[in-house]
Amino acid sequence: MRLLARLIALPVRGYRLLFSPWVGFNCRYQPTCSAYALDALERHGPFKGTYLMLRRIGRCHPFGGSGYDPVPGADPKHDRCCGRTP
């Protein structure tokens, strides 16, 4: 992971360590939003990874979707099925 991506990942890791145990593991998606954020930063770098992370967090609300939603490129079979490009 690039240095900038590691810096962006610090608040996500802090959330997972400090807040997630208190508020519960109640993400609407699989993988969880924090796992998605770390995977997006690792796979796509700091800029596209941050974009994907913010887009996912924006969709995670009671009126948003739910279910299996991996990072583009993480599951090629799912990408082909749904017409997503990495």
From Swiss-Prot:
- Per UniProt, which keywords does this protein have? Cell inner membrane, Cell membrane, Membrane
Its organism's taxonomic lineage begins at: Bacteria, Pseudomonadati, Pseudomonadota, Alphaproteobacteria, Rhodobacterales
Q: Which PANTHER family match?
A: MEMBRANE PROTEIN INSERTION EFFICIENCY FACTOR-RELATED (PTHR33383:SF1)
Q: What does this protein do?
A: Could be involved in insertion of integral membrane proteins into the membrane.
Note the superkingdom of the native organism.
Bacteria
Member of which family?
A: Belongs to the UPF0161 family.
Q: Where in the cell is it found?
A: Cell inner membrane
Entry protein name: Putative membrane protein insertion efficiency factor
